[in-house]
Amino acid sequence: IDDSRIPALGVMGAFVFAAQMINFPVGLGTSGHLLGSALLAVTLGPAAASIVMTAILVVQALIFQDGGVLALGANVFNMAVAGVAAAYLPYRLWNSGRLRNPAIFLGAFLSVLAGAVLAVAELLLSGVRMGQTVLGVSLGLFLVTAVLEGVITVAVIRSLEAMRPNWV
């Protein structure tokens, strides 16, 4: 990583860390929060985004007991690997002209869905039983969260482009 990019890693990591710590209840005993994988992938690139997201998740698990130590591996895979990959692919494919903002939105949307589908699959594989109603409600909540993630990510990226164009 170029030394000139180090401030961007710190600032974007701190922003996503703080945003992830703001949880809002979505029912069924769960909460939602900004994921930030797309925001990090677009501003830092996929490799740096994965490293920063992993650091965020480790600090949250070890210091703030958010996410849990036992779930750390799954969370890193879901958000720092799959989430970043799902976010970066549309951005990489369509990062030009009129398709730029829709690509960023789609990447953010897909990052949430990838993480959600993987989390549900991991829970099911671990023996957690979920009824059809719970799965249906969860899917609806994940879709709403994915749309919000896309809107917020595009808004933050556009603001960054106006203030710090060399960061995006």
Model-derived features: positions:
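Short helix-perturbing small/polar motifs within transmembrane alpha-helices
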Residues: F77-A119
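Hydrophobic transmembrane alpha-helices
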Residues: I1-L39
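Interfacial aromatic-anchored transmembrane helix boundaries in multi-pass membrane proteins
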Residues: M21-G29, A55-A85
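Membrane-interfacial segments
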Residues: D2, I63, G67, A71, ...
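Alpha-helix C-terminal capping segments
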Residues: L39-A48
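Hydrophobic alpha-helical transmembrane segments
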Residues: I6-V11, L35, S50-T54, F77, ...
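Alpha-helical transmembrane segments and their cytosolic interface
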Residues: I1-L9, T133-V168
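Alpha-helical membrane-inserting segments
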Residues: A19, N23, V59, I63, ...
